[in-house]
């Protein structure tokens, strides 16, 4: 797409929109009390956006690294009158300057998931998936995006706990969130918020939210997202949907709360079978009816991925907008007029951590794996991107031997334990000789036990919302059984690269 075509498309889409001359997203977003604010103007910031992952969240595609994707989609994103997108996974080894700069100029902020479909906390075995490989990956992603002012924040996990039975998995997600916050405090020039995006599970809805918001500032989430699809169709309302009950449940919530996914598609269908989504909930979300508790939301989702949630249909370089796109465009144009502090709470009391009950279980947060502690002080090292070894491979019992040239790495991977022996021989200057170093590392055992199996093989990455509509299946939400590799499929070359980072950086401790 050449620049003239890009500009023409932008003007056609924007038409008479009040955002034709969008404000730049050059001011960082900060948190005060239970709300977001523009750090320069001190005006309250309401998240008004869409979830954006062309190709689907289970496919390893980085839409912020491919400039052709950015140039294709940006006019349509602007046309929706949005100020925020959520991106579910990125390649931390790629360059994102052009896309992030274009989004900033268009007045669009980014909320980014740190996990990927191959590097995430597994709901099937959360304890062992919380390891050095996982942390190196999310730290490297922080490094890749920390200098972009229009990064609003990071999600440490997405829908990892999707039933009451696997609620204990939140323990390891919160540990990862804590570690990400510490990494940012030591390795970033600005304090970028870190939060969690939760499935809307009625039995644990409040307990899960309170769990992430409780504790001191070093461990609690900075914000909280809910994936909520309860408002369904033109016959729904503030009370029928249960939104009034959500307002009561979270009236005293202490951190910014927003809908990280919303937009039910269990509605009246068009003649071609596509849903006619009225998006009437937008009128409530961006009003005094909800602004004291909620700070906006993100409609799921921008592109059609075979699940009837898409606002546009993408075919190569061609984008076709739907009736749903036009509906949301008008709703968001009206929502953009809602300003003011929204009766937010400037100094809410810190929440008490929920007690375990028949629905919700938590454990003391595990200590950071010893192999990963050096990343905090020395940095994550080389970003490995989508070629990184999966942390799920470290979750299975496996043994690998890698011998590329003069280096050899013998690694035994057990549940919750990584043992590595690294030997190296070298020749230097006019004299020859060899030196060897042997180091063994064992990750810290979790105080609550060596392992917790938080689900059964019947658990999947999809869930059903309270309204009964089946929501999407997100590859970055957790490691499913298909993401866990056996020893026979363990990728040795990728593991060697990672082991080399540990060895060279001196991060494998005796």
Swiss-Prot record:
Binding, (1,3-beta-D-glucosyl)n 1: 88, 158, 300
Keywords tagged on the record: Cell wall, Cell wall biogenesis/degradation, Disulfide bond, Glycoprotein, GPI-anchor, Lipoprotein, Membrane, Secreted, Signal, Transferase
Binding site for (1,3-beta-D-glucosyl)n 2: 159, 200, 205
Keyword Transmembrane helix: no
Lipidation (GPI-anchor amidated serine): 485
Processing and modification events after translation: The GPI-anchor is attached to the protein in the endoplasmic reticulum and serves to target the protein to the cell surface. There, the glucosamine-inositol phospholipid moiety is cleaved off and the GPI-modified mannoprotein is covalently attached via its lipidless GPI glycan remnant to the 1,6-beta-glucan of the outer cell wall layer.
GO MF entries: 1,3-beta-glucanosyltransferase activity
Cellular-component GO terms for this entry: cell surface; extracellular region; fungal-type cell wall; side of membrane
Positions of region (Disordered): 424-456
Function noted in UniProt: Splits internally a 1,3-beta-glucan molecule and transfers the newly generated reducing end (the donor) to the non-reducing end of another 1,3-beta-glucan molecule (the acceptor) forming a 1,3-beta linkage, resulting in the elongation of 1,3-beta-glucan chains in the cell wall.
Stated family: Belongs to the glycosyl hydrolase 72 family.
Protein name listed in UniProt: 1,3-beta-glucanosyltransferase gas5
Organism the protein comes from: Schizosaccharomyces pombe (strain 972 / ATCC 24843)
Gene name of the record: gas5
């Amino acid at each position: 797409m050449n620049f003239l075509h890009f500009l023409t498309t932008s003007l056609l889409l924007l038409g008479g929109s009040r955002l034709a001359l969008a404000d730049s997203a050059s001011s960082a977003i900060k948190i005060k009390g239970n709300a977001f604010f523009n750090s320069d103007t001190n005006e309250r910031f309401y998240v008004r956006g869409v979830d954006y992952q062309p190709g689907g969240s289970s496919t390893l595609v980085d839409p912020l690294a491919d400039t052709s994707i950015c140039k294709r989609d940006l006019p349509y994103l602007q046309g929706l009158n949005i100020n925020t997108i959520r991106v579910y996974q990125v390649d931390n080894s790629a360059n994102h300057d052009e896309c992030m700069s274009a989004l900033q100029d268009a007045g669009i902020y980014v909320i980014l998931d740190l996990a990927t479909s191959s590097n995430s906390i597994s709901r099937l075995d959360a304890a062992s998936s919380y390891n050095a490989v996982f942390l190196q990956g999310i730290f490297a992603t922080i490094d890749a995006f920390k200098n972009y002012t229009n990064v609003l924040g990071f999600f440490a996990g997405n829908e990892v706990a999707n039933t009451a039975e696997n609620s204990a998995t939140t323990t390891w997600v919160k540990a990862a969130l804590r570690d990400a916050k510490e990494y940012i405090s030591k390795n970033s020039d600005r304090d970028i918020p870190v939060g969690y995006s939760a499935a809307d599970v009625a039995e644990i809805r409040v307990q899960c939210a309170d769990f992430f918001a409780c504790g001191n500032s070093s461990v609690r989430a900075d914000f909280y997202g809910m994936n909520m699809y309860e408002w369904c169709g033109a016959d729904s309302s503030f009370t029928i949907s249960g939104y009034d009950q959500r307002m009561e449940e979270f009236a005293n919530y202490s951190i910014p709360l927003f809908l990280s996914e919303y937009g039910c598609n269990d509605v009246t269908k068009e003649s071609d079978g596509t849903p006619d989504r009225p998006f009437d909930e937008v009128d409530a979300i961006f009003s005094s009816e909800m602004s004291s508790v909620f700070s906006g939301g993100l409609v799921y989702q921008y592109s059609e991925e075979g699940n009837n949630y898409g606002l546009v249909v993408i075919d190569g370089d061609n984008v076709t907008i739907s009736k749903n796109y036009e509906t949301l465009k008008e709703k968001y144009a009206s929502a953009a007029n809602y300003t003011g502090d929204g009766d937010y709470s400037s100094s809410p009391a810190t929440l008490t951590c929920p007690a375990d009950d028949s629905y919700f279980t938590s454990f003391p947060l595990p200590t950071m794996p010893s192999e990963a502690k050096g990343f905090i002080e020395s940095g994550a090292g080389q970003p490995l991107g989508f070629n990184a070894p999966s942390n799920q491979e470290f979750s299975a019992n496996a043994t690998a031997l890698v011998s590329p040239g003069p280096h050899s790495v013998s690694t035994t991977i057990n549940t919750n334990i990584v043992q590595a022996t690294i030997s190296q021989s070298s020749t230097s200057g006019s004299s020859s000789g060899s030196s060897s170093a042997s180091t063994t590392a064992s990750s810290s055992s979790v105080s609550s036990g060596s392992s917790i199996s938080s689900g059964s093989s019947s658990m999947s990455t999809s869930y059903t919302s309270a309204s009964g509509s089946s929501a999407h299946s997100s590859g970055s939400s957790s490691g499913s059984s298909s993401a866990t590799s056996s020893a026979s499929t363990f990728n040795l070359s990728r593991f060697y690269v990672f082991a080399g980072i540990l060895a060279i950086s001196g991060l494998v401790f005796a």
